[in-house]
Amino acid sequence: MDYLPLFADLKQRPVLIVGGGEVAARKIELLHRAGAQVWVVAQTLSSELEQQYQDGRIHWLAQDFLPEQLDNVFLVIAATNDTVLNAAVFAAADQRCILANVVDDQPLCSFIFPSIVDRSPLVVAISSSGQAPVLARILREKLEALLPTRLSDMAAIAGRWRGRVKQHMASMGERRRFWEHAFSGRFASLISRGQLTEAENELQLSLEGQHRALGEVALVGAGPGDAGLLTLRGLQVMQQADVVLYDHLVSPEVLDLVRRDAERICVGKRAGAHSVTQEATNQLLVTLAQQGKRVVRLKGGDPFIFGRGGEELQVVAQAGIPFQVVPGVTAAAGATAYAGIPLTHRDHAQSVTFITGHCRPDGDDLDWQALARGRQTLAIYMGTVKAAAISQQLIAHGRSSTTPVAVIGRGTRVDQQVLIGTLAQLESLAQQAPTPALLVIGEVVNLHHQIAWFGQQPQTESAISPSVVNLA
């Protein structure tokens, strides 16, 4: 170990910064977060530091550095481009046994700054001892993605409750088990949902031995296919699941991110072949949660856009089961972005309408007259089976048969296919497309030939002649 990792209490302690430029400003911002009393030695200040001085956030000594300025200083940072001055600052500090840091000059440092993940009061510091700072930064970025921002609330509440827990539990082992259960159970779930008062109530119930073995349901949008489009929150919830109920639309790449020990149950439905009824899925969510399990209902795209997520949560709520919702990137947004088709464009479409091709059994009540108007984009989910009827209705209500259309099959995945043609050709294109597929109708489809970026470049056929672009 080249450096001993320490966490220093700088609240109201004097820290000297030699230098008044941008580098100094970055270090000063970190010192402010730690509550330090900052003194700056520099002939001039950057505009940012000048404003901080005017606001009374820093003290300014508008003079050259003198060793006497180190008297009663807790630590010092040299942030100038003058190597001679930096060396003098370090030597003077070292002589006085004051910790010193010369920015970007490790030999002249008695302490160094780590990469930091700040979830105060929880702070994670990462250091490569100055040998590989880029690697330390990459690790910090990974931890930023993995550690929920609400950890700060969790740690703060735990700090407030330490005394009460100690009064109730004399054994250190008993206290450890209490907190292990809290940090991985309902207390943590309530924190993640921002329900801080309820979280503290849960701690009180646990202390009183009234903890209920009640699970919860998390409705999570898995996105359109590319696992990279899964949200950080979605990943975090999936990593905590005891059981995952998923649809056929969820890609294998996303399923691979589920916690390894979690039970996986496919409740997917396909057109004309409903393997699990919706009622059975609803009841399964309730039953599993009542067993005390953390249940993730994983749905392709966004669960509240043609995903029946609202129906499922109504049943969960009626059963008194706690739940949360994690939005996902809906297929219309993800697939069109990967196909180079903007849903709106100032010159072509001032609105976009999302439509489902699966109609309720009591009939189709779509306003075809409104949908056939120009200067708008139609994004149709699950519409391949009814592509012929959709095309006929739009043309019958005034939409030009030469209106550009795209059928995007397996959008955002490595085997994505984009088929381009006209409204009159929609049925034929839909029959060729791999599923799941999204239908896009409108002038914005023409932009695909200019700004498609994912995989191979688009073919150069006319925007209104049939073309197939395999973006694998």
From Swiss-Prot:
It catalyses: uroporphyrinogen III + 2 S-adenosyl-L-methionine = precorrin-2 + 2 S-adenosyl-L-homocysteine + H(+); precorrin-2 + NAD(+) = sirohydrochlorin + NADH + 2 H(+); siroheme + 2 H(+) = sirohydrochlorin + Fe(2+). Its EC number is 2.1.1.107, 1.3.1.76, 4.99.1.4. It holds the Pfam family NAD_binding_7. It comes from Yersinia pseudotuberculosis serotype I (strain IP32953). Pathway: Cofactor biosynthesis; adenosylcobalamin biosynthesis; precorrin-2 from uroporphyrinogen III: step 1/1; Cofactor biosynthesis; adenosylcobalamin biosynthesis; sirohydrochlorin from precorrin-2: step 1/1; Porphyrin-containing compound metabolism; siroheme biosynthesis; precorrin-2 from uroporphyrinogen III: step 1/1; Porphyrin-containing compound metabolism; siroheme biosynthesis; siroheme from sirohydrochlorin: step 1/1. InterPro entries: 4pyrrol_Mease, 4pyrrol_Methylase_sf, 4pyrrole_Mease_sub1, 4pyrrole_Mease_sub2, CobA/CysG_C, NAD(P)-bd_dom_sf, Siro_Cobalamin_biosynth, Sirohaem_synt_dimer_dom_sf. The keyword Ribonucleoprotein does not apply. S-adenosyl-L-methionine binds at P224, G300, G301, D302, I305, T330, A331, M382, G411. It comes from the Bacteria. Then it catalyzes the NAD-dependent ring dehydrogenation of precorrin-2 to yield sirohydrochlorin. Finally, it catalyzes the ferrochelation of sirohydrochlorin to yield siroheme. The active site is at D247, K269. GO terms for biological process: cobalamin biosynthetic process; methylation; siroheme biosynthetic process. GO terms for molecular function: NAD binding; precorrin-2 dehydrogenase activity; sirohydrochlorin ferrochelatase activity; uroporphyrin-III C-methyltransferase activity. The lineage of its organism: Bacteria, Pseudomonadati, Pseudomonadota, Gammaproteobacteria, Enterobacterales. This is Siroheme synthase 1. The modification Phosphoserine is found at S128. NAD(+) binds at E22, V23, Q43, T44. Residues 215-472 are annotated as: Uroporphyrinogen-III C-methyltransferase. Residues 1-203 are annotated as: Precorrin-2 dehydrogenase /sirohydrochlorin ferrochelatase. Keywords: Cobalamin biosynthesis, Lyase, Methyltransferase, Multifunctional enzyme, NAD, Oxidoreductase, Phosphoprotein, Porphyrin biosynthesis, S-adenosyl-L-methionine, Transferase. NCBIfam families: cobA_cysG_Cterm, cysG_Nterm, PRK06136.1, PRK10637.1. In the N-terminal section; belongs to the precorrin-2 dehydrogenase / sirohydrochlorin ferrochelatase family. The keyword Phosphoprotein applies.
